[in-house]
Amino acid sequence: MNPIVKQFKYGQHTVTLETGAIARQATAAVMASMDDTTVFVTVVAKKDVKEGQDFFPLTVNYQERTYAAGKIPGGFFKREGRPSEGETLIARLIDRPIRPLFPEGFFNEIQVVATVVSVNPQISPDLVAMIGASAALTLSGVPFNGPIGAARVGFIDNQFVLNPTMAEQKQSRLDLVVAGTDKAVLMVESEADVLTEEQMLASVVFGHQQQQVVIEAIKEFAKEAGKPRWDWVAPQPNTDLINKVKAIAEARLGDAYRITEKQLRYEQIDAIKADVIAQITAEDEEISEGKIVDIFTALESQIVRGRIIAGEPRIDGRTVDTVRALDICTGVLPRTHGSAIFTRGETQALAVATLGTERDAQIIDELTGERQDHFLFHYNFPPYSVGETGMIGSPKRREIGHGRLAKRGVAAVMPSLAEFPYVVRVVSEITESNGSSSMASVCGASLALMDAGVPIKAAVAGIAMGLVKEEEKFVVLSDILGDEDHLGDMDFKVAGTREGVTALQMDIKIEGITPEIMQIALNQAKSARMHILGVMEQAIPAPRADISDYAPRIYTMKIDPKKIKDVIGKGGATIRSLTEETGTSIDIDDDGTVKIAAVDSNAAKNVMGRIEEIVAEVEAGAIYKGKVTRLADFGAFVAIVGNKEGLVHISQIAEERVEKVSDYLQVGQEVNVKVVEIDRQGRIRLTMKDLAPKQETEINQEDPVEEQE
């Protein structure tokens, strides 16, 4: 085995591509490394097309092996299971830029498998997997119009940073991944701390320029190690069939695409499609329905795109930069902590915010270690939202991806844990959908968070842009419909505040999208975002001053860290009894910060008083109220503050001589006692003699407390 190796510098890192030694039965296999993070990527392509296949069956799998980080998986089975949310998102990140580079009509099945086999905690494997997938596809000989490059761009001290390390990323105001060919950008995925449109565009251009070194290196690698390119030829169009479909459907489809209501339009189009299939198959039974449907869909695209390029009104009658009618309601669910319904045309999101305590944080076990997530965002897309029936179950790749995009849009305005000590979960239920439900989720989430009293830094809105480009002519569309997304050349989603952008996602289906076109799209998106924010601010101008009556209120107090063990008790007995008896939730940090969550403020104050008693220092000479816990021949044991036991010797029970302790005291009896001394071993000697007559001399353990809402 003689592996072929290509090594090159990429920013501050060294990238190595190796092939020829492992997985030699795959169509292509590449071991891609960036410093010590290594991802093994394979491509298998079937030479034959399944009979009746009418779509491109590309599958991308990304999997992380725990051995890559020198770990053994947790759980009962001690092996990796179903893909995590992070693995699913990276699989989508690989898929999105490579899918448009396969030619139209190519229906051979292809599977890309990326396996993380070694990980340097400072180098994220996602970029390595993208580069490895690009290299493997380029070597495989399949009709792939790549290679692509991939770059991560950070923004630190007003400077763009190429492929920042994990440590550098913590200081960055931007996390942007851009992928593209030598000619054009194909995909952008980003999260930003409120940057301007100009800064976002500059970061995309910077990343695309820098990744050219990757593209050139893969081309050189393919010259040495690549397989012969397949002699695949695109199927010739059936002009007779195209003309037949046009003759039957063109005029009727033109009329159907003037119906503004989605369901009525779809019913009309489905009826036309069924009629076309029936007429043509009646004449020639050998013609497959799939071919007829492909031509029918192409005709739809031609009609819609032609009208947009010609400057005619869009499908629903709008101009290119008009946002659909908005309708907003907040506080729609009576017992939730915060809720809102955001409706934009025929797209609607019900967003609900829930406040929880630190113990509700999600523990995420990654290759680089465990971390806690205090802001959770979940997006649900049920089939009824598009008037269909279907399976209801665990979230699919699309739902996970849309949820993460919406979360990215809102994350920049969330308060820190120190400012607002709650774990926050937002759920977006898409109840209607006709384009850009992820951006409706951003708007709905912002409204629900404000309704819940979460002190977000600013309202956030999102908008989806589209593009139709024919040769040199192009039109940028604001607030695209589902059909415009499907039939257009670009899906461009922007979320942000009045001050700037918080998230940008872009998927481009064609080459030739210039920075100028992207700048027009960003400017048009900003105008639409300002319009939406204006309507949102009328509905709820600022976060509510108080949280919901049904949300837990968190009260904080400080104790001596040395006393934490006393509050917890043996085996957690003390803290468990406190929570069970008061109905509160108690969290204690290592620095002695105690956070008590309770819906009832009296319960919180009660438990705080009891904690104060537990941690209180017993003072010699002080008088306490205590409870007799047990009797002995030589005296009685009395529990005082914090259940600390002291001994009242038989000689200290009364002024007169005591013959029998039980004649004076009973278990459970409350008595006043005075601390005589605390010896070196911490034992407490008590007396019931020589007590001051007035109750006011007793130690009061109540201190003022701080409430955080």
UniProtKB/Swiss-Prot annotation:
Please give the catalytic activity noted in the UniProt record.
RNA(n+1) + phosphate = RNA(n) + a ribonucleoside 5'-diphosphate
Recite the UniProt keywords alphabetically.
Answer: Cytoplasm, Magnesium, Metal-binding, Nucleotidyltransferase, RNA-binding, Transferase
As for subcellular location, the record says:
Cytoplasm
Q: Which co-factor is required? A: Mg(2+)
Query: What Gene3D superfamilies does this protein's entry cite?
Result: GHMP Kinase, N-terminal domain, K Homology domain, type 1, Nucleic acid-binding proteins
**Chain ranges passing through the membrane:** none
The segment(s) forming the KH domain are 552-611
One GO term of the cellular component aspect?
Answer: cytosol
Residues recorded as binding Mg(2+), renumbered to this chain, are D485, D491
InterPro entries per record: ExoRNase_PH_dom1 (IPR001247), ExoRNase_PH_dom2 (IPR015847), ExoRNase_PH_dom2_sf (IPR036345), KH_dom (IPR004087), KH_dom_type_1 (IPR004088), KH_dom_type_1_sf (IPR036612), NA-bd_OB-fold (IPR012340), PNPase (IPR012162)
Q: Which GO terms describe its molecular function?
A: 3'-5'-RNA exonuclease activity; magnesium ion binding; polyribonucleotide nucleotidyltransferase activity; RNA binding
Which GO biological-process labels does this protein carry? Answer: mRNA catabolic process; RNA processing
Enzyme Commission number, as recorded: 2.7.7.8
> Can you tell which superkingdom this protein's organism belongs to?
Bacteria
Q: Which residues form the S1 motif domain?
A: 621-689
Homology family: Belongs to the polyribonucleotide nucleotidyltransferase family.
The cross-references to HAMAP family, in alphabetical order and at most eight, read:
PNPase
Q: Report quaternary structure and partners.
A: Component of the RNA degradosome, which is a multiprotein complex involved in RNA processing and mRNA degradation.
Q: What does this protein do?
A: Involved in mRNA degradation. Catalyzes the phosphorolysis of single-stranded polyribonucleotides processively in the 3'- to 5'-direction.
- Any idea what this protein is called? Polyribonucleotide nucleotidyltransferase
